[in-house]
Design a protein with these regions (language model features):
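General beta-strand structural signal in soluble alpha/beta enzymes
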Residues: 25, 56-60, 77-82, 88, ...
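Glycine-rich beta-strand-to-loop/alpha-helix junction loops that act as flexible
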Residues: 25-30, 144-146, 257-269
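Phosphate/pyrophosphate-binding loops at sites that engage ATP/ADP/AMP, CoA/4′-phosphopantetheine
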Residues: 6-21, 126-133, 247-258
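Short beta-strand-loop/turn "lid" adjacent to the catalytic site in phosphate-handling enzymes
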Residues: 8-58, 77-79, 85-96
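Internal helix-turn-beta structural module
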Residues: 233, 237-258, 267-333
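Glycine-rich phosphate-binding loop of actin/hexokinase-like ATP-binding domains
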Residues: 86-191
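A mobile "lid/hinge" subdomain adjacent to the ATP/sugar-phosphate binding pocket shared
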Residues: 191-235
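Catalytic phosphate/nucleotide-handling subdomain of diverse soluble enzymes
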Residues: 153-154, 159-195, 201, 264-295
């Protein structure tokens, strides 16, 4: 971070800029404690450290970034923007797992959701693309990168999301399995003799597209599938099937859907994924304009047919802008 700050300082936009009013930090896990952007003081930083067991791969790096930025500009407010915060509006029945309540409460076992800054940005940007107030728009957001998640957003408020206590739940991802029968873990331990750490590594780092066909890059999966590779085709079909299931489920949750928005690396660039995911969903009001869908553009755009009841949008996400916007709004309110 110090090296980045030095590089930015060369053109006057670094941490030493007199125009700097805040430093925004992405913090992956806010638990139930942090449900909105928060100015960081010693107490807040200590609470973020306490959440490390819920995000052992991410929160330690987030803490380090905060510490470095505070040391460089102690006079400027540091703001934590939490990936989980946007999903904190889910009703309790959507956030709870159906396990023993005392055990769940004792170990903070519940659904938190992730990619929240992206889902927040894209849901608002989709409403703007439709020319309607965000409060009037119901949208299913599909954030499809190496990590992938879906959310159901009613009037700018998240009511359901696919990731759970960790980013492992939900859609098929580059290296993560997504939804899985929990008993698979018991089976692998009892019959396969795998340790907890080995199963953790298997499900998070060696599953998903990578586990099914040996590639986690959707471009390679598509190339191989197009050349007749059966394992790549199966991986692609499994990926798309899971997407369809979530689109259908979230259509039921929302009741009325105004748009389905695709975002992130795969969602923005892989027109084949969008086409396959929407194919066959005309009864839900979803029909693509195939030419518009295949055309590339860096701008937010509609790719649905003119007669479609539900818009299909491609909306490039901007998590950095969302973090900056939320941080600025907090310190200038």
């Amino acid at each position: 971070l110090k090296a980045v700050a030095a590089e930015l300082a060369a053109d006057g936009t670094g941490l030493d800029s007199p125009e700097l009013v805040a430093v925004g930090h992405r913090v992956v896990h806010g638990g139930t404690r942090f449900t909105r952007p928060t100015v960081i003081d010693d107490e807040v930083l200590a609470e973020i450290r306490k959440l490390i067991p819920l995000a052992p791969l991410h929160n330690p790096a987030n803490v380090t970034g905060i510490e470095v930025a505070r040391s460089l500009r102690a006079d400027v407010p540091q703001v934590a923007v939490f990936d989980t915060a946007f999903h904190s509006t889910m009703p309790e029945y959507a956030a709870r797992y159906a396990i023993d309540a005392a055990t769940a409460d004792a170990y903070s076992v519940r659904r938190y959701g992730f990619h929240g800054t992206s889902h927040a940005y894209v849901s608002r940007a989709t409403a703007a693309l439709l020319g309607r107030p965000v409060e009037d728009v119901n949208v299913i957001v599909l954030h499809l990168g190496n990590g992938a998640s879906a959310s159901a957003v009613r009037g700018g408020v998240c009511v359901e999301t696919s990731m759970g206590m960790t980013p492992l739940e939900g859609l098929v991802m580059g290296t993560r399995s997504g939804d899985l029968d929990p008993a698979v873990v018991f089976h692998l331990a009892r019959v396969g003799g795998l340790s907890v750490d080995e199963i953790d590594s298997l499900l998070n780092k060696k599953s998903g597209l990578l586990g099914m066909c040996g590639d986690n890059d959707m471009r390679e999966v598509l190339r191989r599938a197009g050349e007749g590779d059966g394992t790549a085709r199966l991986a692609f079909d499994t990926y798309v099937h899971r997407l369809k299931k979530y689109i259908g489920a979230y259509s039921a949750v929302l009741g009325r859907v105004d748009a389905v928005a695709f975002t992130a690396g795969v969602g923005e660039n892989a027109h084949q994924v969008r086409e396959a995911a929407i194919d066959g969903l005309a009864e839900l009001g979803l029909v693509l304009d195939l030419d518009a869908n295949a055309a590339r553009s860096p701008r937010p755009r509609l790719v649905s047919a003119d007669h479609a009841r539900v818009a299909v949008a491609v909306v490039p996400t901007d998590e950095e802008l969302e973090i900056a916007t939320q941080a600025y709004a907090l310190v200038t309110q």
